[in-house]
Each structure stands twice: as C-alpha cells, then as structure tokens.
Amino acid sequence: MSRSIKKGPFIDDHLMKKTLKAKEGKDNRPIKTWSRRSTILPEMIGFTYNVHNGRVFIPVYITENHVGYKLGEFAPTRTFKGHKGSVQKKIGK
C-alpha cells in the first residue's frame, strides 16, 4: 500500500537540512546518510549521497529518474553469489 497523498513524501529532517545546506553552500562533497527510508525529492537532484547498506556506504548520484524512489533502493543490502550449479559427473573409462 502506498503512502497517502495528503501526508506527502517522507524525508528525515536531518537529511533535508544537510541537502539545503549543501545547496546554498555549493558544496560538492557527498552527503553521508543512514536514512534509507527517505524519499528522493527534486531538491536532491545533482547531489551524491553515501547510503549505508549495513556494512559500507554506497555512493548514489541522484538524477531526474530517481525522483520518487527511496534512497535504500539504490544500495543493495544482500550479496547474491549465485545459485548452486549442477555437479558435473565425470565419466572416466
């Protein structure tokens, strides 16, 4: 179920403050955040966010196509190592 339109998109206050501060200061450093649940807004376009995936920070550069998604969608938390392959039986005669 999606979020109610009358509530508006969710973004952590500290993340919005960091974004606005970087925007007015023309700061190009990545913004470090643990807030994977925050929605990407148009004000965030052009900035790089270091999003924590539980182990390391993943750099995410925000473009127009990212607006409306959550920051956590671009920093995967699980490492897929592949399915178990079929064991080839060697027939030697």
UniProtKB/Swiss-Prot annotation:
InterPro entries from the UniProt entry: Ribosomal_uS19, Ribosomal_uS19_bac-type, Ribosomal_uS19_CS, Ribosomal_uS19_SF
Superkingdom, taxonomy of origin: Bacteria
Family matches, as Pfam families: Ribosomal_S19
GO CC, alphabetical: cytoplasm; small ribosomal subunit
GO biological process, one term: ribosomal small subunit assembly
Keyword RNA-binding set for record: yes
Molecular function GO terms recorded: rRNA binding; structural constituent of ribosome
Record's keyword terms, sorted: Ribonucleoprotein, Ribosomal protein, RNA-binding, rRNA-binding
Reported function: Protein S19 forms a complex with S13 that binds strongly to the 16S ribosomal RNA.
HAMAP family from the UniProt entry: Ribosomal_uS19
Family: Belongs to the universal ribosomal protein uS19 family.
Protein's name in the database: Small ribosomal subunit protein uS19
Highest classification ranks of the organism: Bacteria, Pseudomonadati, Campylobacterota, Epsilonproteobacteria, Campylobacterales
